[in-house]
Amino acid sequence: MKISVHAVGRMKAGPERELADRYFERFAKSGPAVGLEFAGITEIAEGRSQSAIERQRDEGSRLQAQLQPGTALILLDERGKSLSSQDLANRIGQLRDGGRKVLVLAIGGADGHDPPLRDQADLVLSFGALTWPHQLVRVMLGEQLYRVATILSGHPYHRA
């Protein structure tokens, strides 16, 4: 299954980007052994409207335009469900084993995801009730994808 990350906004060069890149590279190397191929990161321009609702709609339509029919979609959103790393690995494994060919994990803009997009997602995932900076969400997502690959392969990186 090809896995890509779609993120509203651009991540500037710096230590956060380097750390995120390091985890995504680890995932890219370890994922193929368990049928997960990292297809990269797509950055989506932030909405420019004065209204938060309009920005959500604009960003949501740009994200929607990037999705192929049949794409599995996991949205990262503070209103989502908190899962353990093992549960996330199980969910991604189920999508893979269920025949899904493409999975997009999407990081929304500052206003969150458009409600209709949340409604169509296979999973709305939260990294907890706290609000996280976009840069750290990318780092945490990269680490969790790497962890998912290690869990699915039985690698000792994840020692739960």
Swiss-Prot record:
Binding of S-adenosyl-L-methionine, residues: L76, G108, F127, G128, A129, L130, T131, W132
Alphabetically ordered keywords of this record: Cytoplasm, Methyltransferase, rRNA processing, S-adenosyl-L-methionine, Transferase
PANTHER family reported for this sequence: METHYLTRANSFERASE, RIBOSOMAL RNA LARGE SUBUNIT METHYLTRANSFERASE H
Assembly with partners or alone: Homodimer.
UniProt-annotated location(s): Cytoplasm
Highest taxon in the source lineage: Bacteria
Catalyses which reaction(s): pseudouridine(1915) in 23S rRNA + S-adenosyl-L-methionine = N(3)-methylpseudouridine(1915) in 23S rRNA + S-adenosyl-L-homocysteine + H(+)
Record-given protein name: Ribosomal RNA large subunit methyltransferase H
Assigned protein family: Belongs to the RNA methyltransferase RlmH family.
GO cellular component: cytoplasm
Major localization listed first in the record, in broad terms: cytoplasm
GO-annotated molecular function: rRNA (pseudouridine-N3-)-methyltransferase activity
The keyword Transport appears for this protein: no
InterPro entries, per database record: Alpha/beta_knot_MTases (IPR029028), RlmH-like (IPR003742), tRNA_m1G_MTases_N (IPR029026)
EC number annotated for this UniProt entry: 2.1.1.177
Function of the protein: Specifically methylates the pseudouridine at position 1915 (m3Psi1915) in 23S rRNA.
